[in-house]
UniProtKB/Swiss-Prot annotation:
The lineage of its organism: Bacteria, Pseudomonadati, Pseudomonadota, Gammaproteobacteria, Lysobacterales. Keywords: 4Fe-4S, Cell inner membrane, Cell membrane, Iron, Iron-sulfur, Membrane, Metal-binding, NAD, Quinone, Translocase, Transport, Ubiquinone. Its EC number is 7.1.1.-. This is NADH-quinone oxidoreductase subunit B. It is found in: Cell inner membrane. It comes from Xanthomonas campestris pv. campestris (strain ATCC 33913 / DSM 3586 / NCPPB 528 / LMG 568 / P 25).
């Protein structure tokens, strides 16, 4: 089985396996849906909206940014998952850090992260963003962007493929599904 077939199998539903929401049940199994009512929790509704409209702010620093652009192109088309790249941190809720982060760029990364509205998530893409990569022992390289901002998903590779980034985005969608927004 090829990579595309495996991704198609994984990309069908971001809902964790074994979890069924009222809104997703077939008509015969949900008596309220037959009467014209839809029931769900506020958490499920908010998380459904957040997973269906993730707007990443791209922070491309090196060659991994080329693979990030490839993921948004026609072959994989992130738009069908509700992922639309935004140029401004004030309009985005996901930051994709792709490439080598140097000490001089670290304050700018933190500033952009602080400008994003809550809730916000970070995807670290590539070996350089994850832990310094090939330039790990250089004096000017930050050994992982998780020293500057909290990272939710790590995408390994040098550079990671566009399919790996799509898989990381799907993992982030599953993580968002599991979060509880309203304190009980």
């Amino acid at each position: 089985m090829g990579v595309i077939q495996t991704l198609d199998r994984l990309m069908t539903n971001p809902m964790p396996e074994g979890r069924v929401e009222d809104i997703l049940r077939p008509e015969g199994e949900n008596p309220l849906l037959e009467k014209g009512y839809v029931t769900t929790s506020v958490d499920a509704l908010l998380n459904w909206a957040r997973t269906g409209s993730m707007w990443p702010m791209t922070f491309g620093l090196a060659c991994c940014a080329v693979e990030m652009m490839h993921a948004g192109a026609a072959r994989l088309d992130l738009d069908r998952y509700g992922v639309v790249f935004r140029p401004s941190p004030r309009q985005s809720d996901v930051m994709i850090v792709a490439g080598t982060l140097v000490n001089k760029m670290a304050p700018a990364l933190r500033k952009v992260y602080d400008q994003m509205p809550d809730p916000k998530w970070v995807i670290s893409m590539g070996s350089c963003a994850n832990g310094g990569g090939y330039y790990h022992y250089s004096y000017s390289v930050v050994r992982g962007c998780d020293r500057i901002v909290p990272v939710d998903i790590y995408v390994p590779g040098c550079p990671p493929t566009a399919e790996a980034l799509v898989y990381g985005i799907l993992q982030l969608q599953k993580k968002i599904w599991r979060t509880q927004t309203i304190a009980r």
